[in-house]
Amino acid sequence: MSPSLMVYVPAIVCLFLLIHQVRRKRTSNLSLPPGPKGLPVLGNLLDLDGRQPWITFTQWASTHGNIIYCRLLGLPVVVLQSQEVAKALLENRSSIYSDRPPISTRKAIGSEFNTAQLRYSDEWRLHRRIFHQSFRPEAADAYLPTQLHKAHQLLQGIIETPERYQRHIELFASSVIMSAVYDYDAKPKDDPLLLAADKAIKVFVEVASTRTAIILETFPFLLKLPAWFPGASLKRLAIQSQKNSAAMVDIPFRYARERVMTATSNRCMISESYERIDVQNNADEFELALKSSSATAFIDQTASTLIIFVLGMMLSPNAQKRAQAEIDAVIGTERLPTFEDRSSLPYVEAVLRETLRWHPVFPLGLPHYTSDSDMYNEHYIPKGVMVVANIWAMSRDEAKYPNPNDFNPDRFFMPDGQLNDDTVDFSFGFGRRICTGKHFANASLWIAIVSLLATFRFMKPLDDDGKEVDPIFEWTTGIVSHPVSLPCRVLSRHPGTTTEKLSDIIELSV
């Protein structure tokens, strides 16, 4: 090294250290979003309601505002409590907020297939493009006849066994997905593929809950314990989730692929996607992405939302009567509603919106993850933190939704009697991670709701003295929230309606 260069080396080193110190000081002086104080190591984990963490987050908003910072077992989390903040960050700055947290346990719990959990990458873009091509609004309309047919099957199932209405709703939601994605016509009763898919999803949403996911991510050794080891319940749950998910991904895909290859498949996501496949360019990669993205469709909110709709109708009989009166006035009783009637039934539309708002089935959605640091309203949001959109808090915004715990479809009407422009899209997520199948899901929800309202009354259960009582039930835990075993008296609106008579009405409606 020359003497002249040796003179500059210390100066360069000092300059580097000075710049580093200035940057470090500048970062340390930046203010993180406000939030509750936590304990060492545990952070705020013990403060959370383990079954309904969104309730705790919403309570924190009243003290700390619409953007808060907390730590859960050492993991930094930013919670967005209002639509305004969520849109400002997750949509307007989507280049920073479109990633997902790095989940090292994805393989262990069998969620590698899940497009929604993929990191923001070329792999995710391929998955999303495949799904979007089949379920974008103009493409999803091709499935309307299938959704109508499945809604009619739902009615027939409930007429036969009204006490199993919740199971019929679950079968409706799954069978619509199976038909649209795999061209699989599910059996009305106890279809093996539907049962396998339902079992897989129920275990997955439990193991993927916020609290469980954080525990597994912080203490991954829990998944390395022998399944027989005392206290290894999470390990056993992960094994069950992995096994169930593998069956849910592989079996229906093999069925659909075989039908495509033998030219016996009707239009569905799989057949459409194979028509677009470029055999000269990563065909294997495309097929793997197709198999995974198609299975992601099972993580659907339709069944959960419809069960919440039933609860809303029981607890708000006036809303139920008004919706049914509108249907009778527009359509009559000689046929069932179709999609062509949708624009003529604004109150039914308001019932759907209120169902989505009243109890969001994904109260926290899925967490985002910052790919870079950011500043918002003088608050510093570091790179590499989990960002959660608290959908529940947004649904409880009293400035926008007065008396938010009431089921009140009237809140979606303007003074002139027209529907307002609030379609409750926040329930489907934000930014580039918004649910790509929301148009398809919305259509399934509407045709099911309007068909159920046209055909049945949803009444509170009776006590031993024959008096109506409020239903007693529990809510699911995990990333999806809906009533479990919701007691309800489902009665035909037209006494004497049999399966045969309903079939005749259905024939007049198609």
PLM segments and residue spans:
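Conserved cytochrome P450 K-helix/beta-meander segment immediately N-terminal to the heme-binding cysteine loop
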Residues: 375, 389-417, 505-506
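Classical protein tyrosine phosphatase
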Residues: 79-89, 98, 183-194, 300-325, ...
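Conserved cytochrome P450 K-helix E-x-x-R motif and the immediately C-terminal K′/meander segment
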Residues: 45-58, 63-65, 247, 334-378, ...
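Cytochrome P450 catalytic-domain helical core, especially the substrate-recognition surface
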Residues: 37-55, 76, 103-182, 195-258, ...
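Cytochrome P450 heme-binding "Cys pocket" and the immediately downstream C-terminal segment
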Residues: 317-319, 439-483, 491-497
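N-terminal membrane-proximal hinge/A-helix region immediately C-terminal to the signal-anchor transmembrane segment
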Residues: 2-109, 148-153, 382-383, 424
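Central I-helix of cytochrome P450 enzymes
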Residues: 173, 241-254, 278-328, 355, ...
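Cytochrome P450 heme-thiolate "Cys pocket" and heme-binding signature region
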Residues: 414-447, 472-477
